[in-house]
Amino acid sequence: MKLKSDFLGLLYSRGYFNQCTDLAELDQLMSKECVIAYIGFDCTARSLHIGSLMQIMILRYLQKCGHKPIVLLGNGTTKIGDPSGKDKSRTLLSSSDIQENTLGIRKVLEKFIVCGGGVSDALLVYNAEWLDKLNYIDFLRNIGRHFSVNNMLTFDSVKLRLEREQNLSFLEFNYMLLQAYDFIELNQRYNCLLQIGGSDQWGNIVNGVELGRKLKLPQLFGLTTHLLLTSTGEKMGKTADGAIWLDGEMYSPADYWQYFRNVKDEDVGRFLRLFTELPLTEIEKLENLKGYEINEAKKILATEATRICHGEKIAQDIAYDALKVFECNDHSGLPVFYVCKSEIELGLSVVKLLQVSGMEKSNSSAKRLINDKGCKINDIIILDVNYKLSLQDFCGMSYIKLSCGKKRHLKVVLESDL
C-alpha cells in the first residue's frame, strides 16, 4: 500500500496497522501537518505489561515522525472497568489503588517517550479531570441521546457476555459512552484528531468518531492495530507464571531479555518489526537466518527490546552475561552427561533429561523444579514443563549447560550416533 504519511507508512510496513475509519483522508492530513493523537491506558495495575508494548511503540513513532502523542491515563474510567475482552466484571478498585497504579504506569511510560512542552513531546492527561465533574443529567441529555442501545448491543464486548448469559453491569455498559466522551474532551481541549487502540477497541473508537460527527466537530479519526498474538495464537502479555511487566522491579530486566530470547522461531521477524527500531533491511536479513543461526537474531531481538524498555547499559550488560555462558565461561570442571544426537532431533523433553541424568530423582520433582523457575539451559530459565530440547538449543556448540538452582550444573554433551 502506497501511503504519503511517514507515520502511517511505518505502521503498515512494520505490521502494526489493522484498520482505520478513513485512511485516505488521515493519510493526506498526516502527510501535511503535525497531528495530535491519543492512546488510552486504564490504571488497573501498578505497571503495564508487554500486551501494551505495541501501543507504546506507536507513541514513540508518533514522536519520531513529528506528530504529538497524548497519553490518556484512565484514572476515571478505571473506576468503572472496560468490559472489552472480559468474561466477567472487573473487581472495582479503591481510589488509593487507582492513584498508586496511575503513578506506576506514568513511571513506566516515561521510560519510553519524551514528555514535556515541545512540539512533538507527549502530554500525559488524566480523564478523572473531567469525568469526576460530570453532571449525570447533563451527560445523558448532551451525550447519551446520541447513542443507540440497539447498536450498543451489537458490540462484541456486550454481545458475547449476553450470549454466554454472563453478567454485564449497567456500570460497564456505560464504559463505551465515557470512552467516546474522552475523545470529545481531548479534541476540544487539545485539538486531538486521532484515537489509536488495539483491534478489540474498534467499537469504542468508532463510537467516539461518530459522536464527534453528531456534535458537528471537525472530522475525527480512529485507527486500530492487530491484537498482539504469538504464532500459536496466544494473546501476548502473560505466561503461565504471570505477566511480563515493563516495570523492572516487578519483572527483572534479565528475565525480560530471556523472554524475548526464548520466542519461537516463527515469531522472530514479526517481533523484530514490532518491538525494535532496527531498519527493515536489517530485519529482513536476520529473519532469513536458518538453523541455529536464528539464535543470533533472537539475541539481537532480546537486546534491542530490553534497550528500549530498560536502557542501553542494562541491555548490553545482560547480553554480555549471556554471551559469557559459552565464550567466556570454562565449563571443563562440570560433570558430563552424554545424549545422542538422534534423541535431540526427535525432541528430548527437559523433564526426561533431568530425570535420566540424575539431576532430579523423578519426573514429578523435575516438573516442580521447572514450575519454581529453578531449571535453566545456558542460564536461560525454562518456563514450560513440556519444553523439548532441539539442536538449536546447542547454538552450534557440542554441549549445553543444564542448571538446577544456583549450585547444581551439568554439561550435556552431544554425542554422534554410532
Curated annotation (Swiss-Prot):
Which positions in this protein are listed as binding ATP?
238
Taking every annotated instance into account, which residue ranges of this chain make up the domain S4 RNA-binding?
A: 348-413
Q: Indicate the enzyme's highest-level EC class.
A: ligase
Give GO cellular component annotations, separated by semicolons.
cytosol
GO MF: ATP binding; RNA binding; tyrosine-tRNA ligase activity
Q: Does the keyword Ligase apply?
A: yes
E.C. no: 6.1.1.1
User: What residues does L-tyrosine bind to?
Assistant: 38, 175, 179
User: Which keywords fit this entry according to its UniProt record?
Assistant: Aminoacyl-tRNA synthetase, ATP-binding, Cytoplasm, Ligase, Nucleotide-binding, Protein biosynthesis, RNA-binding
- The motif 'KMSKS' region: which residues? 235-239
Main location per the UniProt record = cytoplasm
| Catalytic reaction list | tRNA(Tyr) + L-tyrosine + ATP = L-tyrosyl-tRNA(Tyr) + AMP + diphosphate + H(+)
Cited SUPFAM superfamilies:
Alpha-L RNA-binding motif (SSF55174), Nucleotidylyl transferase (SSF52374)
| Function of the protein | Catalyzes the attachment of tyrosine to tRNA(Tyr) in a two-step reaction: tyrosine is first activated by ATP to form Tyr-AMP and then transferred to the acceptor end of tRNA(Tyr).
Q: How does it assemble?
A: Homodimer.
Protein name per the record: Tyrosine--tRNA ligase
Q: What is the lineage of its organism?
A: Bacteria, Pseudomonadati, Pseudomonadota, Alphaproteobacteria, Rickettsiales
